[in-house]
Amino acid sequence: MKQQFICERRPKADPRNIVLGKNYRITFLTDRLVRFEYNESGAFVDEASQVIWYRDLEEVPFEIKQKNNFLEIQTKSIRIRYDERAFDESILSVKLRKPDNGCDLEWYYGKKEDRNLFGTARTLDEADGRIRLEKGILSRDGFAVLDDSKTILLTEDGWIKERKHGGEDFYLFAYGHDYRGAVKDFFRVTGRVPMLPKYALGNWWSR
């Protein structure tokens, strides 16, 4: 693809923000936005996906230690407990420390998002009346998951390719009820939504 058609992307995360094991990788994009990957083959994705283009954000300070056979990783906002095996509700949990309501909130892998505030619909094709919206990045539960495991990848030369190795690849938004902060950081990793220039809309007239 010609260079002028290739959009800017920075998909490789800062190595200082990564916790790497044999079959897992945990990447901190912010102190409240975390990427979790698990793959039995030990293969992980550094290319941009359809959704996530920018993983190279600022350094996120964190502390890591072993406690009772669990890995504990702590930023200024969250604490992760993980025992380094395939993700399961008893294997991986995250606690958000004293968000806006003053009480800790806890998420575990596979937890139902009953109070997710939903996002958008991919298309309105053949829509007739109410349509089902997809899960979004905001939730009254304080946590939301963006599953990126099956999206197409973007190559450096501007083309697309399928994921070869399977595995899990998801992003946990642990923002409590700070919805504005969650949306702001979402745009930091996805890029701004391109808007049509006014001249492309032609003349508008109403009376």
Regions found by a protein language model. Name each.
Residues K2-A13:
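Short, Gly/Pro- and small/polar-rich lid/capping loops
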Residues I6-E8, W53-L57, N116-T120:
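Short Pro/Gly-enriched beta-strand edge/turn motifs at strand-loop
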Residues K65-R207:
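Catalytic and substrate-binding clefts that recognize carbohydrates or anionic sugar/phosphate headgroups
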Residues Q4, L29-N68:
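A low-complexity, Ser/Thr/Gly/Pro-enriched, surface-exposed linker/loop concept
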Residues P11-A13, G21, F28-D31, E63-E72, ...:
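Short, ordered beta-strand-loop transition motifs
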Residues A13-P15, K22-Y24, R132-E134:
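Generic recognition of flexible, low-complexity loop/linker segments
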Residues V19-N23, T75-I78:
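Glycine-centered tight beta-turn/hairpin loop motif at sheet-sheet or coil-to-beta transitions
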